[in-house]
């Protein structure tokens, strides 16, 4: 039996990372946090570093500037990093839960066929966590990450007073992209570039289950668990 793949979709601050961590623990999956992979690759890059994909050079310093402005990086570069990691996890026979990929149609067309081939269509589950724009802006402006592993901690009544990461115990700090202007830019990108993926998934015979993300972390998790078993 092939391992399970769960794709968690949702606007910024919807709790994708938190739910992915819970699902990873529940089903013994690798939490594929795309933002963490991006940040680690950019942090390790030196001046002038680039990656050549399809004959085009992608300079990491320029990609970093896009990210800092709340703009999305070039999809070919993201897909390159994501697919390399997927192949490595498949060789280890490890299941995956995604929080942040795929984000664009380009990325989906590169990632989904690979996932189908390596894991099988029946083992791919997609969850869309829904929330209003004002909720997203408020949550994002309060969201924090831990210094050690950059776990994203959703701001809720349960986490408001936390000073240390519940996953690794390191100090919690505010994210660099917590500025309201950056958040609004990301929300615009999400509506224009990510939501259209739902139609693509349907064409690929993949079901998308919707969950109300404006509940407590525990309630959202219960609804996701139910959706996965429907």
Enumerate the predicted regions with their spans.
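Glycine-rich phosphate-binding loop of ATP-dependent small-molecule kinases
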Residues: 1-230
